[in-house]
């Protein structure tokens, strides 16, 4: 598409004012006529030809354009600090910088002045001395060896020889075992007259294995490590190293090497046999899960709870047939799943029993009860039909729920909980809590009187109300102490109540005995009557005083009953009336006589009637 076509599409006029200029003529330069390889190289460039810049050659061009002087080198001596011979000196080439040396010398002279210059003949150390790492072997004294390092098969000289080899060869055990040549020194015998000791005893040499050398070295190292720093003060890496060396087992190391050697030297047939055994083991492991499930199902079938029903129903042929039909029906219903005690439901869906055995026993008992007057075959045919009817919807729903539920866990007994350390803690609320809050709740739930009683008991035991250091163990013991104190106070409360009831009944008994006693003769002198009335009044006052003492004790404990309190109040009123008018008869004597029981028809004296009135009022109030 040309420019004129574009202008026609865009409805633009011709932009040319004058005549169009003619095209410039291309001046085609003569192309070189190349042939062969030069032509192919020229064509590789395409439209952009390769520019070939001619190289300007110079005659006898200088090789090095730098005008710097050549570096100077010198032979410097040095030493190697890793070597034991300090006088051994070596030499190597080092670059010498004259300018830098001149500047350093001038600066040192200016800064130091008249100070003595350091020695120039000090030798530099080798750069490879830092790679010579010395192994630290355990060191011990004669006393330490005699105390903790003695061994039956090892002497001190041989142990020293082993440690020297370990230090020389940097604990490279193959080299140590290869260079280990211990010859025990000869023991001289008795000398002859001429002084000849030809009867010297040379002990036999003993060959040491690599594991024996390791075991002896690790034993010495672990014991000396524990002697220098106790085990309880070691860090975690030090303790791990100590445990590794102290529990080195040479026999296990030998077995490991033998196993590795046998694995490397086995033949192809043995390798194939081992591979086949490994494949068989994998198959066994793959089938083990299914085998375990079947075994668990069998155990569940055998480990059923004992039934309390009578087994006489299963002694007949009809009972056995009915039992077999029930078991088959239960298996079909559960689709060959495990018959757990909580998962088995009754096929009829009426009353689900606990186990399949119980269900079959109940169904069989019902069938045996219905077969009275029938033949055994009829009972055997009708019994299973009644128990194997179609299950309604509720039974199916219960079966599904039972399948979804997990297996119930067996509850542990008290002995098993103590054996396994099972504890039951209180449920904690949200947010942080303190142990002291739990103790404060034990006090806050009590009344003021009970809190005072608990505080008094704790003061008697010299136990503070608030714990100084409420740790978990201390808090637990404190809770047990408070529980024991509460039990003690409850027992005291019940004891006081029983004592008060016993005293009340004793007073009633004494009153009844006085009522049933025969009346005295009317010819008794008036002075005698007066003395008797005074004596009775004294008895009434003593009884009232006893009741008053009981009342004060009951007020202190705060646990007296309403009946006892009423009796005490009546006793106090009676004591006041008796003390005010001991000789005057009371106004309500006739009324009191009417209120007496039918057995007390004889006349009584003033003190007896008053006590009878008190006891009757207390009985009425107790009835109310």
From Swiss-Prot:
Record localization: Nucleus
One GO term (biological process): negative regulation of transcription by RNA polymerase II
Molecular function in Gene Ontology: transcription corepressor activity
InterPro entries in alphabetical order: DAMP1_SANT-like (IPR032563), Swc4/Dmap1 (IPR027109)
Keyword Cell cycle: no
Biased composition (Basic and acidic residues): 504-514, 585-597
UniProt keyword list: Activator, Chromatin regulator, DNA damage, DNA repair, Nucleus, Transcription, Transcription regulation
Coiled coil start-end: none
Region listing for Disordered, in residue ranges: 1-34, 96-120, 334-411, 504-624
Superkingdom of the source species: Eukaryota
GO CC annotation terms, alphabetical: NuA4 histone acetyltransferase complex; Swr1 complex
Span of domain SANT: 146-221
Biased composition (Polar residues): 108-120
Ranges of biased composition (kind: Low complexity): 356-371, 388-406
Functional note: Component of the SWR1 complex which mediates the ATP-dependent exchange of histone H2A for the H2A variant HZT1 leading to transcriptional regulation of selected genes by chromatin remodeling. Component of the NuA4 histone acetyltransferase complex which is involved in transcriptional activation of selected genes principally by acetylation of nucleosomal histone H4 and H2A. The NuA4 complex is also involved in DNA repair.
Assembly: Component of the SWR1 chromatin-remodeling complex and of the NuA4 histone acetyltransferase complex.
Similarity comment: family membership: Belongs to the SWC4 family.
Name the UniProt record assigns to this protein: SWR1-complex protein 4
Gene source species: Gibberella zeae (strain ATCC MYA-4620 / CBS 123657 / FGSC 9075 / NRRL 31084 / PH-1) (Wheat head blight fungus)
């Amino acid at each position: 598409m040309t420019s004129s076509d574009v202008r026609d599409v865009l409805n633009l006029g011709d932009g040319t004012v004058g005549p169009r200029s003619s095209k410039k003529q291309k001046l085609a330069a003569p192309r070189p006529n190349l042939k062969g390889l030069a032509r192919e190289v020229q064509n590789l460039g395409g439209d952009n030809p390769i520019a070939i810049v001619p190289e300007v050659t110079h005659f006898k061009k200088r090789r090095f354009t730098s005008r710097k002087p050549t570096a100077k080198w010198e032979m410097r001596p040095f030493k190697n600090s890793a070597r034991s011979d300090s006088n051994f000196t070596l030499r190597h080439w080092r670059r010498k910088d004259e300018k830098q040396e001149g500047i350093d010398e001038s600066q040192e002279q200016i800064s130091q002045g008249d100070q003595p210059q350091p020695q120039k003949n000090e030798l530099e150390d080798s750069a490879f001395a830092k790679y010579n790492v010395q192994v630290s072997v355990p060191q011990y004294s004669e006393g330490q060896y005699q105390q903790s390092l003695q061994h039956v098969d090892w002497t001190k000289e041989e142990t020293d020889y082993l440690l020297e080899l370990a230090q020389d060869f940097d604990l490279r055990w193959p080299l140590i075992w290869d260079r280990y040549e211990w010859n025990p020194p000869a023991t001289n015998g008795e000398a002859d007259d001429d002084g000849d000791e030809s009867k010297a005893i040379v002990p036999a040499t003993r060959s040491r294995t690599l594991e024996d050398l390791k075991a002896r070295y690790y034993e010495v190292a672990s014991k000396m490590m524990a002697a220098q720093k106790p085990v309880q003060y070691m860090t975690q890496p030090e303790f791990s190293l100590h445990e590794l060396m102290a529990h080195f087992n040479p026999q296990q190391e030998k077995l490991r090497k033998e196993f590795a050697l046998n694995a490397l030297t086995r033949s192809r047939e043995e390798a194939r046999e081992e591979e086949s055994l490994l494949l068989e083991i994998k198959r066994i492991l793959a089938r083990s899960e299914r085998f375990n499930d079947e075994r668990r199902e069998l155990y569940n079938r055998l480990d059923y709870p004992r039934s309390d029903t009578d087994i006489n129903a299963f002694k007949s042929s009809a009972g056995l047939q009915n039992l077999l039909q029930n078991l088959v029906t239960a298996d079909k219903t559960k689709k060959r799943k495990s018959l757990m005690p909580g998962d088995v439901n009754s096929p009829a869906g009426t009353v689900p029993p606990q186990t399949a055995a119980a269900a079959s026993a109940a169904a069989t008992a019902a069938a045996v009860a219905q077969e009275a007057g029938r033949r055994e075959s009829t009972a055997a045919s009708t019994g299973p039909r009644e128990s194997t009817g179609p299950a309604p919807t509720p039974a199916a729903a219960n079966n599904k729920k039972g399948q979804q539920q997990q297996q119930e866990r067996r509850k542990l007994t008290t002995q098993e909980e103590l054996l396994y350390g099972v504890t039951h803690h209180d449920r904690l609320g949200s947010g942080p809590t303190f142990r002291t809050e739990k103790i404060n709740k034990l006090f806050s739930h009590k009344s003021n009187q009970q809190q005072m009683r608990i505080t008094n008991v704790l003061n008697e035991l010299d136990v503070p109300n608030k714990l100084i250091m409420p740790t978990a163990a201390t808090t637990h013991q404190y809770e047990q102490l408070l529980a024991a104190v509460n039990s003690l106070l409850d027992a005291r409360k019940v004891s006081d109540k029983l004592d008060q009831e016993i005293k009340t009944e004793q007073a009633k008994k004494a009153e009844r005995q006085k009522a049933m006693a025969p009346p005295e003769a009317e010819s008794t002198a008036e002075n005698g009557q007066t003395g008797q009335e005074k004596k009775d009044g004294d008895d009434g006052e003593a009884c009232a005083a006893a009741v008053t003492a009981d009342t004060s004790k009951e007020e202190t404990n705060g646990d007296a009953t309403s009946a006892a309190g009423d009796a005490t109040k009546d006793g106090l009123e009676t004591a006041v009336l008796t003390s005010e008018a001991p000789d005057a008869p009371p106004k309500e004597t006739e009324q009191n006589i009417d209120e007496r029981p039918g057995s007390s028809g004889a006349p009584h004296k003033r003190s007896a009637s008053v006590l009878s009135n008190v006891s009757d009022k207390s009985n009425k109030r107790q009835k109310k």
